[in-house]
Amino acid sequence: MENQKQRLGRLAEDAAQAFLENQGFTIVERNYRTRVAEIDIVAKEAETLVFVEVKARGAFSRGGPREAVSLAKQQKIILGARFFLMERGLVDVRVRFDVVAVYEENNAFRIELIRNAFQTD
């Protein structure tokens, strides 16, 4: 049985997927997992493969969504993206790392897309 945080996370991912699709993204995969990382959503926007971290912020959450994706979390997502590309034999592919912030407000969601939230260096 899922707890309140898990429920909010699942609903936020569903809302984020619908939002991205409405923005013209094509969803490639959800909840991609490796031994070291999980990527919430892998999507395509035009010719760019986008790795998306979904951050749900409830009424009592502290900090913004960008701050919620720590440097360590960014590194895990980047590593997961490398595994994804390698497993599928994808080379010379344009990639981007976005964060979708899902704010729960008055039993509804407000969604913010943060493009290029972080990059590989």
Curated annotation (Swiss-Prot):
Disulfide bonds: none annotated. Gene3D superfamilies: 3.40.1350.10. It comes from the Bacteria. InterPro entries: Restrct_endonuc-II-like (IPR011335), tRNA_endonuc-like_dom_sf (IPR011856), UPF0102_YraN-like (IPR003509). SUPFAM superfamilies: Restriction endonuclease-like. GO terms for molecular function: nucleic acid binding. Belongs to the UPF0102 family. This is UPF0102 protein HRM2_30940. It comes from Desulforapulum autotrophicum (strain ATCC 43914 / DSM 3382 / VKM B-1955 / HRM2).
